[in-house]
Amino acid sequence: MQVKRTTVEKIRIEDINETHRLDPVEVIIENYGEGAGKIIITCWGESWTGFWGSMGGTIEEFFQRVSNDYLINKMADYRESEPDTDGDSDFLRSEIIRQRKDGRLDRSEAAAAWRYVDDFSPDRNSLYYGKTPDELAVLEGMDEPWYFPWPNKPNHKYQYLSRILDVVREVIKPDEQRSV
């Protein structure tokens, strides 16, 4: 049997509501040895965990070198943006106008497509997984609607975790890297 002992550091960050609009954040850091360790971050009942087996330093040093995007991808399944399905009908209308101006649609095709969008308010999922209605099939690219630049909106969970990581990064910064 092999027994290894490590030191665990727990940090509680309070009074950050004014500067970062966050509730208290707790951070638990465990460095297993050179280049291996884990971190657990909790805030308002949610927690995020990351483990790295070969990061070339301590967790504290590693956090200074990597981006929030990398950390969020490793610690949570959040994307920077998410589909804005509320804007799908407006997007289709703008696409009808654009293709009409470009001469790809004649007046009657554009009018029929516009009426269809007004009457049925189709969303991207119904067009991805269903049969494309004849009124919208005249739009160039509608045979493969997943390639359209559908509208997205910022993912609030991603932004929230990014703000937390900014605070954690500043607090766990090694002493020689801290700003005075």
Could you describe each region identified by the protein language model?
Residues M1-E46:
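Short N-terminal edge-element motif at the start of the domain
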Residues M1-Q2, D15, F63, M75, ...:
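Hydrophobic, Leu/Ile/Phe/Ala-enriched alpha-helical segments that form helix-helix packing faces
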Residues T19-R21, T49, R79, P83:
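Residues in flexible loops and secondary-structure boundaries
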Residues Y32-D77:
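Aromatic- and glycine-enriched beta-alpha-beta binding-site module
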Residues F62-Y116:
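An exposed acidic His-Trp-rich patch
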Residues D102-V180:
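A eukaryote-biased signal for long
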